[in-house]
């Protein structure tokens, strides 16, 4: 895996101010990496720290009344929380969702408790959001580079996840 960090021109105060300069800088760096590795990239996972991400934590719950927690229950809960996010902040898009806590009958569970029986299931989720226009600009730049973005992540989130993983 290759990592490259290059100061970008055309970005000021976390806003793309010149899409052509940003595209030129990124495409030149991609070309150099492709030449060095002798490959042509078709898609990418983008880790960025030049933009201001918003973070919203929400909890959702499902009354089970002694029944089994099913995948459909969790899917419904996730979709309803995503809908809440889109109603709360229509100018931003969800970039990443992180499950931070699972509770079954008020007891913390380490893994998704699909298949377990209980009376009440609750889940806390953290939503990372990015401004819609910033997101459109990012996609436009990488489309011009003939790269499909598979995922966008915040650099601070990735560093935090690595720190947690290295400590366990």
Where do the PLM segments sit?
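Nucleotide/phosphate-binding catalytic cleft detector across ATP-hydrolyzing
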Residues: 1-43, 48-168
């Amino acid at each position: 895996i290759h990592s490259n960090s290059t100061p970008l021109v055309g970005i000021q105060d976390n806003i793309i101010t010149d899409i052509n300069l940003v595209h030129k800088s990124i495409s030149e760096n991609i070309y150099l990496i492709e030449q060095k590795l002798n490959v042509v990239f078709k898609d990418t996972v983008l880790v960025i720290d030049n933009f201001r991400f918003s973070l919203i934590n929400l909890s959702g719950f499902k009354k089970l009344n002694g029944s089994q927690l099913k995948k459909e229950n969790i899917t419904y809960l996730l979709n309803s929380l995503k809908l809440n996010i889109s109603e709360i902040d229509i100018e931003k898009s969800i970039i990443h969702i992180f499950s931070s806590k699972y509770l079954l009958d008020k007891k913390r569970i380490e893994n998704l408790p699909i298949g377990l029986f209980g009376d009440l299931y609750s889940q806390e989720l953290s939503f990372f959001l990015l401004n819609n226009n910033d997101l459109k600009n990012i996609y436009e730049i990488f489309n011009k580079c003939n790269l499909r973005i598979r995922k966008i992540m915040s650099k601070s989130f990735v560093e935090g996840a690595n720190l947690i993983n290295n400590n366990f």
